[in-house]
């Protein structure tokens, strides 16, 4: 998990909304993700990004909704994901969005 946290940043992210019901049993990974994204070190990578914690008491499924600057949206349902899976998916999408914004092709699509 340390590797996923080391490359975590909010450079191409416009908004992160984390929604969960704290009384459900499957919210630990979503809360860990929120804690990682809300840290001062990560938030300092993009001061214009808003991180919103939407805590509800309705038994809803934990969900992370990420809106990127280019309009791309990443939605992760946290009920069956670990915190490391969520952080690595988030980091890989940020890397892909950064490569798309700079005009480079992602390194995974180098085949002919």
Curated annotation (Swiss-Prot):
Domain of life: Eukaryota
InterPro entries documented for this protein: mtLSU_mL53, Ribosomal_mL53
Pfam families according to UniProt: MRP_L53
UniProt entry tagged with the keyword Zinc-finger: no
Location within or outside the cell: Mitochondrion
The keyword Transit peptide is annotated on this UniProt entry: yes
GO CC aspect terms: mitochondrial inner membrane; mitochondrial large ribosomal subunit
Main location: mitochondrion
Alphabetical keyword list: Mitochondrion, Ribonucleoprotein, Ribosomal protein, Transit peptide
PANTHER family, A to Z: 39S RIBOSOMAL PROTEIN L53, MITOCHONDRIAL, LARGE RIBOSOMAL SUBUNIT PROTEIN ML53
Family classification: Belongs to the mitochondrion-specific ribosomal protein mL53 family.
Subunit record text: Component of the mitochondrial ribosome large subunit (39S) which comprises a 16S rRNA and about 50 distinct proteins.
Name of protein: Large ribosomal subunit protein mL53
Protein's organism: Bos taurus (Bovine)
Organism placement in taxonomy: Eukaryota, Metazoa, Chordata, Craniata, Vertebrata
């Amino acid at each position: 998990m340390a590797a996923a946290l080391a490359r975590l940043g909010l450079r191409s992210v416009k908004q992160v909304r984390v929604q969960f019901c704290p009384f459900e049993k499957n919210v630990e990974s979503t809360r860990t993700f929120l804690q990682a994204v809300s840290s001062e070190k990560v938030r300092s990578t993009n001061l214009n990004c808003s991180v919103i914690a939407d805590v509800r008491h309705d038994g809803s499924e934990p969900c992370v909704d990420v809106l990127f600057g280019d309009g791309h949206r990443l939605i992760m349902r946290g009920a069956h994901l670990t915190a490391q899976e969520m952080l690595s998916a988030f980091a890989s999408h940020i890397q892909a969005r950064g490569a798309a914004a700079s005009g480079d092709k992602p390194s995974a699509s180098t085949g002919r």
